[in-house]
Amino acid sequence: MRHYEIVFMVHPDQSEQVAGMIERYTGSITEAGGTIHRLEDWGRRQMAYPINKLHKAHYVLMNVEAGQEVMDELETAFRFNDAVLRNMIMRTKGAVTEQSIMLKQKEERAERAPRRDDREERAPRREEEAKPEAAAE
Protein backbone atom coordinates (compact mmCIF):
# COMPACT_ATOMS: atom_id res chain seq x y z
CA MET A 1 0.00 0.00 0.00
CA ARG A 2 1.09 3.53 -0.72
CA HIS A 3 0.87 6.74 1.27
CA TYR A 4 -1.26 9.63 0.02
CA GLU A 5 -2.08 13.17 1.07
CA ILE A 6 -5.60 14.26 0.18
CA VAL A 7 -6.96 17.80 0.36
CA PHE A 8 -10.49 18.60 -0.70
CA MET A 9 -12.54 21.78 -0.62
CA VAL A 10 -16.28 21.68 0.05
CA HIS A 11 -18.89 24.27 -0.97
CA PRO A 12 -19.40 26.65 1.99
CA ASP A 13 -23.18 26.08 1.98
CA GLN A 14 -22.53 22.36 2.57
CA SER A 15 -20.30 22.83 5.64
CA GLU A 16 -22.79 20.98 7.85
CA GLN A 17 -22.38 17.86 5.73
CA VAL A 18 -18.58 17.75 5.93
CA ALA A 19 -18.61 15.42 8.95
CA GLY A 20 -20.73 12.90 7.05
CA MET A 21 -18.50 13.17 3.99
CA ILE A 22 -15.40 12.55 6.11
CA GLU A 23 -17.05 9.50 7.70
CA ARG A 24 -18.00 8.13 4.28
CA TYR A 25 -14.52 8.63 2.81
CA THR A 26 -12.63 7.32 5.85
CA GLY A 27 -15.01 4.36 6.04
CA SER A 28 -14.29 3.36 2.45
CA ILE A 29 -10.54 3.59 3.11
CA THR A 30 -10.61 1.51 6.31
CA GLU A 31 -12.98 -1.10 4.83
CA ALA A 32 -10.45 -1.75 2.09
CA GLY A 33 -7.70 -2.32 4.66
CA GLY A 34 -6.21 1.17 4.55
CA THR A 35 -5.22 3.33 7.49
CA ILE A 36 -5.69 7.02 8.20
CA HIS A 37 -2.57 8.62 9.65
CA ARG A 38 -3.80 12.22 9.89
CA LEU A 39 -7.21 13.86 9.53
CA GLU A 40 -7.60 17.62 9.89
CA ASP A 41 -10.71 19.71 9.36
CA TRP A 42 -9.43 23.23 8.67
CA GLY A 43 -12.92 24.71 8.51
CA ARG A 44 -14.10 27.56 6.30
CA ARG A 45 -11.24 29.55 4.86
CA GLN A 46 -10.73 32.26 2.29
CA MET A 47 -9.67 30.83 -1.08
CA ALA A 48 -6.75 32.25 -3.05
CA TYR A 49 -9.02 32.92 -6.02
CA PRO A 50 -12.78 32.62 -6.62
CA ILE A 51 -14.17 29.31 -7.85
CA ASN A 52 -17.70 29.39 -9.27
CA LYS A 53 -18.11 32.91 -7.81
CA LEU A 54 -17.33 31.61 -4.31
CA HIS A 55 -14.64 33.18 -2.14
CA LYS A 56 -14.66 30.72 0.78
CA ALA A 57 -14.61 26.94 1.09
CA HIS A 58 -14.45 24.28 3.80
CA TYR A 59 -11.04 22.57 3.71
CA VAL A 60 -10.21 19.00 4.82
CA LEU A 61 -6.77 17.33 4.88
CA MET A 62 -6.20 13.58 5.13
CA ASN A 63 -3.01 11.51 5.11
CA VAL A 64 -3.81 7.89 4.36
CA GLU A 65 -2.20 4.60 3.47
CA ALA A 66 -4.31 2.73 0.92
CA GLY A 67 -4.29 0.74 -2.28
CA GLN A 68 -4.75 2.14 -5.77
CA GLU A 69 -8.28 0.72 -6.11
CA VAL A 70 -9.44 2.69 -3.06
CA MET A 71 -7.85 5.87 -4.36
CA ASP A 72 -9.55 5.45 -7.74
CA GLU A 73 -12.87 4.97 -5.94
CA LEU A 74 -12.24 8.05 -3.80
CA GLU A 75 -11.32 10.16 -6.82
CA THR A 76 -14.54 9.09 -8.54
CA ALA A 77 -16.52 9.98 -5.41
CA PHE A 78 -14.95 13.46 -5.41
CA ARG A 79 -15.67 13.92 -9.11
CA PHE A 80 -19.37 13.07 -8.83
CA ASN A 81 -20.00 14.96 -5.58
CA ASP A 82 -21.20 18.45 -6.51
CA ALA A 83 -20.34 19.79 -3.05
CA VAL A 84 -16.60 19.12 -3.59
CA LEU A 85 -15.23 22.17 -5.41
CA ARG A 86 -11.64 20.97 -5.78
CA ASN A 87 -9.56 18.01 -4.65
CA MET A 88 -5.93 17.04 -4.77
CA ILE A 89 -4.51 13.57 -4.18
CA MET A 90 -0.73 13.37 -3.95
CA ARG A 91 1.43 10.33 -3.36
CA THR A 92 3.94 10.79 -0.52
CA LYS A 93 7.05 8.85 0.43
CA GLY A 94 5.89 7.99 3.93
CA ALA A 95 3.23 8.45 6.57
CA VAL A 96 2.81 12.03 7.79
CA THR A 97 1.41 12.19 11.31
CA GLU A 98 2.46 15.56 12.73
CA GLN A 99 0.15 18.57 12.65
CA SER A 100 0.08 20.66 9.52
CA ILE A 101 1.15 24.29 9.48
CA MET A 102 -2.45 25.37 8.90
CA LEU A 103 -3.67 23.68 12.08
CA LYS A 104 -0.73 25.02 14.10
CA GLN A 105 -1.58 28.57 12.98
CA LYS A 106 -5.22 28.04 13.91
CA GLU A 107 -4.23 26.90 17.41
CA GLU A 108 -1.86 29.85 17.82
CA ARG A 109 -4.69 32.23 16.94
CA ALA A 110 -6.92 30.51 19.47
CA GLU A 111 -4.25 30.96 22.14
CA ARG A 112 -3.89 34.67 21.29
CA ALA A 113 -7.65 35.29 21.39
CA PRO A 114 -7.89 35.35 25.22
CA ARG A 115 -5.12 37.95 25.28
CA ARG A 116 -7.24 40.20 23.06
CA ASP A 117 -10.13 39.77 25.47
CA ASP A 118 -7.85 40.85 28.32
CA ARG A 119 -6.92 44.00 26.42
CA GLU A 120 -10.57 44.82 25.81
CA GLU A 121 -11.28 44.47 29.52
CA ARG A 122 -8.38 46.78 30.39
CA ALA A 123 -9.28 49.44 27.83
CA PRO A 124 -12.40 50.74 29.65
CA ARG A 125 -10.35 51.12 32.85
CA ARG A 126 -7.96 53.49 31.10
CA GLU A 127 -10.90 55.51 29.81
CA GLU A 128 -12.33 55.67 33.33
CA GLU A 129 -8.97 56.93 34.59
CA ALA A 130 -8.96 59.62 31.90
CA LYS A 131 -12.46 60.87 32.80
CA PRO A 132 -11.58 62.20 36.29
CA GLU A 133 -8.65 64.12 34.79
CA ALA A 134 -10.97 65.73 32.26
CA ALA A 135 -13.40 66.66 35.05
CA ALA A 136 -10.59 68.29 37.07
CA GLU A 137 -9.78 70.67 34.22
UniProtKB/Swiss-Prot annotation:
It comes from the Bacteria. One of its GO terms (molecular function) is structural constituent of ribosome. Coiled coil: none annotated. Pfam families: Ribosomal_S6. Gene3D superfamilies: 3.30.70.60. InterPro entries: Ribosomal_bS6 (IPR000529), Ribosomal_bS6_sf (IPR035980), Ribosomal_S6_plastid/chlpt (IPR020814), Transl_elong_EF1B/ribsomal_bS6 (IPR014717). GO terms for cellular component: cytosolic small ribosomal subunit. Residues 96-137 are annotated as: Disordered. The keyword Zinc does not apply. Keywords: Ribonucleoprotein, Ribosomal protein, RNA-binding, rRNA-binding. Binds together with bS18 to 16S ribosomal RNA. Belongs to the bacterial ribosomal protein bS6 family. This is Small ribosomal subunit protein bS6. It comes from Vibrio atlanticus (strain LGP32). The lineage of its organism: Bacteria, Pseudomonadati, Pseudomonadota, Gammaproteobacteria, Vibrionales.
